[in-house]
């Protein structure tokens, strides 16, 4: 395996070279990091599958990665993409505020306003659309347009809906309990925390 040090001198040099050609993502963050990771996977052409998961998971268990990979690496299955989900309850309270209070009601409102569509049905079918855990078969990577901000999870789902049949897409229950570092609400600053996440 390879570790990409996104703030290290080698990747910073590559980033500058790509920026000079207007090819590099211009926003720092998860989307940019994923863009470089997937780019390296495509360039090396050695991995059959790639999985991504958030790095701030407090309840991490290595079985999560195995569960995430299994549907896309098992040759018996025809899945190109797997999205993880898990309960968003920890310390006797409901988490997943952006998914619960913005994304789910927004999808319902859109459906009531513009009517049902394959896209809205697809997005509503995911138990936790903002999960940062997903895996792909390698051939999927060159088809993806990657968002460089907090919108990466919704963007990846949109790309999968655009490029693949629902029969090639699955969801997997990753954990009985899941907790991660929570973002501040940031009511007074839309460039941070949940405010930025919701806008993106």
Model-derived regions: residue spans:
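C-terminal catalytic/acceptor-binding lobe
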Residues: 150-200
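Short beta-strand-to-loop acidic/aromatic patch adjacent to the donor-nucleotide binding site
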Residues: 44-58
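Conserved donor-nucleotide/metal-binding helix-loop-beta segment in metal-dependent transferases, i.e.
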Residues: 58-88
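Conserved nucleotide-sugar donor-binding
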Residues: 104-114, 127-143
